[in-house]
Structure formats: C-alpha cells, structure tokens
C-alpha cells in the first residue's frame, strides 16, 4: 500500500508540473494573440481599401489600355535575381492583370505553422488542402505548392506533392518586410509560367474559439473578389498616368494580400494554441483532482487497515 501511495504522489507531482508548463504556454499565447489580433483588425481596414481600389481599377476601362490578352511570359523568365520594383513595367502589368487563355497549372500558397502544440490549427490546414488537391487530381489538374510554414511543407513532401517553394520562421508577430521574399517568389513564378493562376490559402481568425479556412485568388489580379456592393465608376481620371498608378497600386496589393493572410493566420494560430493549452491545463487539474481523491481513499484504507490490525492485536493479548 505504501508503494502505491508513493506512485500516486509521483503521478500527481508530474502532472502538476505539466499543468504549470501548459498554463505558462497559455499565458504566452494569450499575449501574442492580443498583439496580433489588434494588428490584424487595424490592417484589415487598410487591406480592404487596397483590394477595393484594385478591384475598381480592374473593372474600369483603363485595364484595356495595358494591351491585348497574352499568354506570353515576361522578359524576366529564367532569371533568378530580380529587383522587386522591376516586376511592374507596363508589359509585366499586362501579364499580371490579364488571365491566360489556358490554365495548365494552378499554384497554391499555403500558410501553416512551424510547430505543434497549436490544437487543430495545422491539421485543419492540411485537411482542407488535401481535399482541394484530391479534387484537382480527379480533374487531372497540375498543382504547384508554395508552403509558408514547415508543418505543411514537410507533410506535403511526404505525400510526394509538388512543393516548389517553402518558407519557414515567420515571426510570432509578423512584420511587413518578412513577406518581401514570399511576394517576389510568388510573382516571379507566375511570370515565369510555373503556374497560370495563384490562390492564397490560410486560416481566417474569427474569434478566440472560431476560425475559418479561406482560399482567395491572387493572380491574375483581374480574378480578385471583394465583399462590397459599391457602384463602381466605368472609368477614372488617372494622374500622372496609368503606368505610374498601377506600378504603385499593384505591388501594394500583392504585399498587402500576402501579409494580411499571414497576419490573420498567425492570429488564428495563437488563438488555437491558447485554447489548446487552456484545455490541457484544465485536463491536468481534473486528472490531479481525481488522483488526489484516489490518494485520499488509499490513505483512508491504509489507516483503517492499521487500526484494525492494532485492535486485533490488542484483543489477542486479552
């Protein structure tokens, strides 16, 4: 019985330590969530305005002045070191705006986490993407994957899927500069004909307990969709010229879309982590409570046995 009591005490101590760790992780995730949630809410306002501006421009007559629809890839094809600003010359703008006549390959920029202990966050990303890839395979569609986050990248490679780019190590509170390489690569691959359309796939943060998986079109830019019902003018007065305006607006659109998705996904990841650690801490408390009850019963049984033995011995002496 003494050995059993000792084992129970060891279990209680071990689980209490685990509970302390998960509680500390919950608090850390909560701090990160507060920071990213505030940034996400503020950035969403800016991001929606950029998307609305681009959507308005795409629906106006100025796009027709960029040239006829083309399936030709840009002059940057085959180059590896491209200056970011040089993406957006007039010919390249036409390539980014006009849909291609034939969709031979589809790119998916998938945002996941770099580590576990985040609840169902990563598994839901993978589950949703595998469903998309299964449908694409059934239709004999070629798929190219750009993976932001090591969890998804490693899983997709184990499944022998075509991961053409991977990026890991995004900060817990992402910065605008971090998306630079991702945007450059995504646009360059589109211009080089690696894929003919690109979708950004990520987890949208709704609230602490709720998230929603989103798949949004990024390239070609004419395919973007926004949630507004404003009456859009048929044309604009452009100053100083179309080229200058689009060279400014389209890079902002590309960066804001990817950064917004990463920031939103990080917020959802922190919320999932906090919820998971809170649940783990509560489970640890419940297990400890059950073990303490079991320990007290074992102690009571031990005391009862000892008293019975003492009484029995005393009676034997009479």
UniProtKB/Swiss-Prot annotation:
Entry keyword annotation includes Ion transport: yes
Main localization, broad class: membrane
PROSITE patterns membership: ATPASE_GAMMA
Topological category with respect to the lipid bilayer: Peripheral membrane protein
UniProt cross-references to Gene3D superfamilies, sorted A to Z: 3.40.1380.10, ATP synthase, gamma subunit, helix hairpin domain (1.10.287.80)
GO molecular function per UniProt: ATP binding; proton-transporting ATP synthase activity, rotational mechanism
Entries under PANTHER family matching the protein: ATP SYNTHASE GAMMA CHAIN, ATP SYNTHASE SUBUNIT GAMMA, MITOCHONDRIAL
Subunit structure: F-type ATPases have 2 components, CF(1) - the catalytic core - and CF(0) - the membrane proton channel. CF(1) has five subunits: alpha(3), beta(3), gamma(1), delta(1), epsilon(1). CF(0) has three main subunits: a, b and c.
Function as written in the Swiss-Prot or TrEMBL entry: Produces ATP from ADP in the presence of a proton gradient across the membrane. The gamma chain is believed to be important in regulating ATPase activity and the flow of protons through the CF(0) complex.
Protein name: ATP synthase gamma chain
Organismal lineage: Bacteria, Bacillati, Bacillota, Bacilli, Lactobacillales
